[in-house]
Structure formats: C-alpha cells, structure tokens
C-alpha cells in the first residue's frame, strides 16, 4: 500500500498491535503471556503493514515483554495466547521464576535510582544553603562610652576563651562483602544505593548473588559489590 503512515517508536508499534490484535496485546492494564514463537506469527500476519520491519517488531516485543505489567501477568496457572487470543498452553515454572526475578531486579533498580536522586537533591540543597547568607539584623547604635578621666588606672581586659572548633560529623564506615559464601541466612548487612546504605537481612545465597529482605519487606537479589557490613 502507498502513503502508509510510519511508526517511529516501539510504543507506537505496541499501540498498533493492541489495536490490530486486541485479544493478544493490550495497551494498558495487566498483559497476557504471549505464545512462544509469536514473533514469526507477527511477521507472517503484519508483513508490509504500516511499513513495519522485523527489527521494529522485535524491539517492540522486547519492550512489551519486559514491562512491569507483562511480568505481573506471568504467574503460575496463566495461559499463553496467540495473536487471536486462542490458548497455547500453561506457563512453565521456569518461565514464571524468570519473570519474577526480572520484576524484582527492575524494582530494585528503580528504588536505587530514586535513593541516589534524593541523595543528590539533599547535597544540592545543603550546598545552596551554605552559599545563601541569612538576612542580617539591623544593628542598633551603641551608646557612647563615658570618657575615662585622665590619670585613671586602666583595668586589664579579660581574655576571651578561644572558641572550640566544631567537630566534623563522623562518617559511617562500611566494610564491603568480599566473599558471599561466608554469609549465613538471617545475617544482617546493608545494601548500597547511591550514597545511602539500607538495612537488610540475608534470605538466600544464589549463583546470581544474595537474596536479601529490606526493612520495607521487599526481597531482591543483590550482587556482592553492593553489599556492606
């Protein structure tokens, strides 16, 4: 077809697929798990439409299946669907576990980014506060001191005690975790997020890192370089 509009972003491609295959794709809300091999089905069904290329379809599928709402839908008992919404088998346990880990890691990244941004804002606010001087109070003129009579003996001035220099705040030092195999379940440690360190408890030692639980109740897998005592 001539003069077809071109989709320029993966989000636009996803919106097109949700309109073209409403029983398979969704533009909002919890998404349904897709049939394995659905990429080839898409190539066969929408080849040439909207000037879509295989690269655009592959990028849109990658964005769609890595979104939080799609990962939420990958859960035990969920059924995969094809382009027309027909069931294509129940999800396997390994796929459910993989999606759960992806979701936890994504949430942890977002939380770490927020903590880092908040720390930078605090530092910027503190720096700005040091530069801005407080408004000065208008000084009242001092009354003139009475003149000392000639020949009167001067009293020695009392020396002012030297002002003590303010103590610098003690910086909390953390010891990095060098060997995760030495950790034990239930052990308390901290997870580094930017300039902050969040309290956590060891739940499990895995090949990918250490599964910990934060004080908020959230559990996530963290690599050794982000763990300190």
Swiss-Prot record:
One of its GO terms (biological process) is post-transcriptional regulation of gene expression. Keywords: Chaperone, Cytoplasm, RNA-binding. Residues 105-178 are annotated as: Disordered. The keyword RNA-binding applies. The keyword Chaperone applies. GO terms for molecular function: RNA strand annealing activity; RNA strand-exchange activity. InterPro entries: ProQ (IPR023529), ProQ/FinO (IPR016103), ProQ/FinO_sf (IPR036442), ProQ_C (IPR035236). One of its GO terms (cellular component) is cytosol. It is found in: Cytoplasm. Residues 117-136, 147-176 have a biased composition (Basic and acidic residues). Residues 137-146 have a biased composition (Basic residues). Its main location: cytoplasm. Belongs to the ProQ family. RNA chaperone with significant RNA binding, RNA strand exchange and RNA duplexing activities. May regulate ProP activity through an RNA-based, post-transcriptional mechanism. HAMAP family: ProQ. This is RNA chaperone ProQ. It comes from Escherichia fergusonii (strain ATCC 35469 / DSM 13698 / CCUG 18766 / IAM 14443 / JCM 21226 / LMG 7866 / NBRC 102419 / NCTC 12128 / CDC 0568-73).
